C-alpha cells in the first residue's frame, strides 16, 4: 500500500511540475508579445508578432531540446545552443523551423544507426552521437544569422520565394535552405555511405581507393544519400510553404525548393569531401585498425593537413553553399 502511495505522489509531483513549466512558458511568450506590441506602438515600422507565434517559438524548441537530451542526441551545451537556434528560426519563419527539425531528427537517428559498425573504423565515434554547442552552431549558427537578417528585412512570417517581388528575402530563404540542406547531405553521406557501400571509398582529389572513414572519401551510396538528405530538407520546407503561405496561386512556383534542396545536399557533400581531403588530416592507425584525425606515431598518413577539424569543414561548406545556391536559383527560378 505504501508503494502505491509513493507512486501516486511521484506522478502528482511530475504532473504539477509539468503544469508549472507550461505556465512559465505561457508567461514568457506573453511577455515577449507585450514587448513586441509596445515596440510596434512606438515604432510604426515594426509589426507586432502574434501571441500564438511567440508561444510556438518558445514552446516548440523546449520540447524538441528536451527530447534530444532524453534520447542523448544533445549534451547540456548543445541543448542551450539548440534552444537559441530553434527559437530564432521558429519565430522568423515556420518553413525555416521545419527544415531545421527535419535535419535534426533524421540526422540524430542516422548518427545512432549501426553504431557498432561505425566504432570499427571511426576513432572519434561517440556513443549516442551527442552534439555539443560547437556542432550545433557550426550547423545552425549560419541559418540563425540568416533568419535574423530575414526578420530585419521582412519581419517574422512566411512568404513565397519569388525573386521578382521579394528579391532580398527570397535570397535569404534560399541561402538558409542551402545551409541546412548542405549539412543534412553531408550527415547522410557520412552516416549511410560507409555502412551500406559495398565498394571501397575513393579519395575525391586523386580518385585512389582509401580506407572506410577517410576524410574526403566518396562512394556512390554516399553521394546518393547526400542527395536524398538535402531533398528531405527541401521537402519539409516546401510542404510548410503549402500549409502556411497564403495566395500561392498568384506567386512564383515553389516546387523548385525540393530540387534546390537536393542540389545543395549533393554539392555540399562534395565540397565537404574536397575540403576534408586537403585540410583535414587522415591517417590509418595500424594498431587499432581505425582512421585517426591527428598525426600519431602509429598512424600511417593517407591524406590532408591538420588545418581544420570536422566542425570547421562543415561550417565552411555550408557557407559556400549558402552563397552559391540563391545565386544559381535567381537565374533559373520560374517566373510568372
From Swiss-Prot:
Sorted keywords for this record are: Membrane, Transmembrane, Transmembrane helix
How does this protein lie in the membrane?
Multi-pass membrane protein
Recorded hits in Pfam families, A to Z, give: DUF92
TM ranges: 19-39, 49-69, 86-106, 224-244, 250-270, 313-333
Locations listed in the record:
Membrane
**Would you name any one GO CC term?**
membrane
Q: Which InterPro entries match?
A: DUF92_TMEM19
Q: Which PANTHER family match?
A: TRANSMEMBRANE PROTEIN 19
Indicate the family of this protein: Belongs to the TMEM19 family.
* Name by which UniProt lists this protein: Transmembrane protein 19
Q: What is the native source organism of this protein? A: Xenopus tropicalis
Amino acid at each position: 500500500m505504501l508503494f502505491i502511495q509513493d507512486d501516486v505522489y511521484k506522478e502528482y509531483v511530475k504532473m504539477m511540475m509539468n503544469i508549472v513549466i507550461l505556465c512559465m512558458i505561457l508567461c514568457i511568450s506573453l511577455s515577449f508579445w507585450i514587448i513586441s506590441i509596445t515596440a510596434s506602438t512606438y515604432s510604426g515600422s515594426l509589426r507586432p508578432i502574434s501571441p500564438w507565434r511567440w508561444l510556438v517559438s518558445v514552446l516548440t524548441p523546449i520540447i524538441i531540446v528536451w527530447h534530444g537530451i532524453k534520447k542523448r542526441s544533445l549534451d547540456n551545451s548543445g541543448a542551450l545552443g539548440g534552444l537559441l537556434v530553434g527559437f530564432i528560426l521558429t519565430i522568423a519563419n515556420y518553413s525555416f523551423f521545419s527544415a531545421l527539425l527535419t535535419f535534426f531528427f533524421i540526422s540524430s537517428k542516422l548518427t545512432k544507426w549501426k553504431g557498432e559498425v561505425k566504432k570499427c573504423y571511426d576513432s572519434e565515434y561517440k556513443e549516442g552521437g551527442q552534439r555539443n554547442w560547437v556542432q550545433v552552431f557550426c550547423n545552425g549558427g549560419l541559418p540563425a544569422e540568416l533568419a535574423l537578417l530575414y526578420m530585419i528585412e521582412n519581419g517574422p512570417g512566411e512568404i513565397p520565394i519569388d525573386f521578382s517581388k521579394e528579391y532580398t528575402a527570397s535570397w535569404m530563404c534560399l541561402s538558409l535552405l542551402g545551409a541546412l540542406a548542405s549539412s543534412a547531405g553531408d550527415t547522410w553521406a557520412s552516416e549511410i555511405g560507409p555502412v551500406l557501400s559495398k565498394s571501397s571509398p575513393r579519395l575525391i582529389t586523386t580518385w585512389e581507393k582509401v580506407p572506410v572513414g577517410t576524410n574526403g572519401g566518396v562512394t556512390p551510396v554516399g553521394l546518393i544519400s547526400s542527395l536524398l538528405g538535402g531533398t528531405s530538407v527541401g521537402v519539409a520546407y516546401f510542404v510548410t510553404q503549402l500549409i502556411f503561405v497564403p495566395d500561392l496561386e498568384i506567386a512564383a512556383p515553389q516546387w523548385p525548393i525540393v530540387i534546390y534542396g537536393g542540389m545543395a545536399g549533393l554539392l555540399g557533400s562534395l565540397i565537404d569531401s574536397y575540403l576534408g581531403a586537403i585540410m583535414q588530416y587522415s591517417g590509418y592507425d595500424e594498431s587499432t585498425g581505425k582512421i585517426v584525425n591527428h598525426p600519431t606515431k602509429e598512424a600511417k598518413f593517407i591524406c590532408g593537413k591538420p588545418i581544420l577539424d570536422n566542425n570547421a569543414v562543415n561550417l565552411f561548406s555550408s557557407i559556400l553553399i549558402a552563397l552559391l545556391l540563391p545565386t544559381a536559383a535567381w537565374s533559373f527560378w520560374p517566373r510568372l
